[in-house]
């Protein structure tokens, strides 16, 4: 099963989500669209276990984790949309 971490434009670049991830799915990348100049990205979504520690660590409720079941069906696991 694949998990995808959805990233939105309210990231403050604090890196708390990156540090909270037990499988190192997240990393910070340059991003001009936020004040911090960097944003959390999830290049290794296949390693995500859906624990939502990144969501819990995020001070701005910025992240959303979704579980994709098959090609078109999804079940939301996130808090922020």
Curated annotation (Swiss-Prot):
Cross-referenced InterPro entries: 4Fe4S_Fe-S-bd, 4Fe4S_Fe_S_CS, PSI_iron-sulfur_center, PSI_PsaC
Keyword set includes Metal-binding: yes
Name of the gene this protein is made from: psaC
Protein's name in the database: Photosystem I iron-sulfur center
Membrane topology designation: Peripheral membrane protein
Cofactors, names only: [4Fe-4S] cluster
NCBIfam families reported for this sequence: PS_I_psaC
Residue sites binding [4Fe-4S] cluster 1 per the record: 11, 14, 17, 58
Subunit structure: The eukaryotic PSI reaction center is composed of at least 11 subunits.
4Fe-4S ferredoxin-type domain mapped to chain residues: 2-31, 37-68
SUPFAM superfamilies per the UniProt record, alphabetical: 4Fe-4S ferredoxins
Keyword Repeat in annotation: yes
Binding residues annotated for [4Fe-4S] cluster 2, in chain numbering: 21, 48, 51, 54
Chief localisation class: plastid
Catalytic activity, EC: 1.97.1.12
Protein location: Plastid, Chloroplast thylakoid membrane
Molecular function (Gene Ontology), one example: oxidoreductase activity
GO annotation terms (biological process): photosynthetic electron transport in photosystem I
Keywords, in A-Z order: 4Fe-4S, Chloroplast, Electron transport, Iron, Iron-sulfur, Membrane, Metal-binding, Oxidoreductase, Photosynthesis, Photosystem I, Plastid, Repeat, Thylakoid, Transport
């Amino acid at each position: 099963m694949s998990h995808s971490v959805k990233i939105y434009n309210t990231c403050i670049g604090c890196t708390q989500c990156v540090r909270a991830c037990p499988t190192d799915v997240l990393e910070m990348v340059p991003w001009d669209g936020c004040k911090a100049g960097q944003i959390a990205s999830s290049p290794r979504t296949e390693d995500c276990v859906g624990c939502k520690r990144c969501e819990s660590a995020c001070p701005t409720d910025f992240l959303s984790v979704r579980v994709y079941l098959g090609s078109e069906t999804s079940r939301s696991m996130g808090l922020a949309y």
